[in-house]
Amino acid sequence: MVAIAPNPHSGQSVKTIRENLLTPRFYTTDFEQAAKLDLSRQQEQLEAMLAEMRADYNRHHFVRDDSFKGTWDLLDAQTRKAFIDYLERSCVSEFSGFLLFKELSRKLKDRNPLLAEIFHLMARDEARHAGFLNKAMMDFGHAMDLGYLSKTRTYTFFPLPWVLYTVYLSEKIGYWRYIIIYRHLEKHPEHSFYPLFNYFERWCQDENRHGDIFKALIHSQPQLIQGWGAKLWMRFFLLTVFATHTLTVHERAKFYEALGLDATAFDREVIAKTNETAARTFSVVLNVDHPEFYSRLQRCVEISNKLQAIEATHQPKWLKALRKLPHQLAIAGHLLRIYLLPPVNAQQEWGTVH
């Protein structure tokens, strides 16, 4: 289960997190619409995935071993801060998934038993992940008070189709983040400064499995992949997830540097792999090979750094907001230009929708 409160000897209990556009949100959705989903087109696939989830291949994986008994005081202050921020946001993201899946399972229990059990088991996985990350933070004198957060943070309503798109992408991009870091450290163990990374290979299997479940849910609803409206939304959410990833990775560049990774190269590999994976689910994906794609994302990073510099000043809030506005509009302009780039027709590679 999720660790709600820290060990009293482990240090500071964190009850709030720094809120900005990159902070993971807590979501709610249209449970009535979810209960009415016709899953017949993907019934066989979903039942097979449910059997996998019941098998619970990772039931014994998230157990801390003796490697966690070391000391991490040798990390420099910048790397330590960036790593704690990484753990904190990752923990909140996993806990957000737990809350959403748990509520979906509860609401659907009597009306859509198949989907209810799937969400129940996905909530189990997310709880494990959040709890494991929270224990990692305790090693650095921090811990999230997740119970407090669940009661006090604002929940954002997302229509069900948005939930399906975004959670699918979140799980798949999470898979690629974990496996790329794991494979890199497998080749360069000298950069593995904390034992959490040894768990990423099996961990990412949960992310991949969850993503496959959401792929089946999306494909069970043809209106989510067909028609111009659906294609515009798919492009929008791909861009939103990729832009958020780019800004977040570069904000934590010191963390990736400590792992022996170049933040920009890592970001681009994760985006390329996720876009390639999404092409098996979405009927259109972004053209990440277009020369403007990464160059405009990089400009967003540079502008974001200026926004952070403004926020760090002691000026009045109204003046900060005024100074930020042209930079925020500039980021919006770059993202709009990326969005308007001709997309890639992924569906032509499938043959037929199934």
UniProtKB/Swiss-Prot annotation:
Record's keyword annotation contains Metal-binding: yes
Reactions performed catalytically: Mg-protoporphyrin IX 13-monomethyl ester + 3 NADPH + 3 O2 + 2 H(+) = 3,8-divinyl protochlorophyllide a + 3 NADP(+) + 5 H2O
InterPro entries assigned: AcsF, Ferritin-like_SF, Rr_diiron-bd_dom
Known cofactor(s): Fe cation
MF terms in GO: iron ion binding; magnesium-protoporphyrin IX monomethyl ester (oxidative) cyclase activity
Chain segments annotated as transmembrane: none
The enzyme's E.C. designation: 1.14.13.81
Pathway annotation: Porphyrin-containing compound metabolism; chlorophyll biosynthesis (light-independent)
Record keywords: Chlorophyll biosynthesis, Iron, Metal-binding, NADP, Oxidoreductase, Photosynthesis
EC primary class: oxidoreductase
Keyword Iron: yes
UniProt record, GO biological process: light-independent chlorophyll biosynthetic process; photosynthesis
Function as written in the Swiss-Prot or TrEMBL entry: Catalyzes the formation of the isocyclic ring in chlorophyll biosynthesis. Mediates the cyclase reaction, which results in the formation of divinylprotochlorophyllide (Pchlide) characteristic of all chlorophylls from magnesium-protoporphyrin IX 13-monomethyl ester (MgPMME).
Annotated family: Belongs to the AcsF family.
Alphabetical list of NCBIfam families matching this protein: AcsF, PRK13654.1
Name the record gives this protein: Magnesium-protoporphyrin IX monomethyl ester [oxidative] cyclase 2
Species annotation: Thermosynechococcus vestitus (strain NIES-2133 / IAM M-273 / BP-1)
Gene, per the UniProt record: acsF2
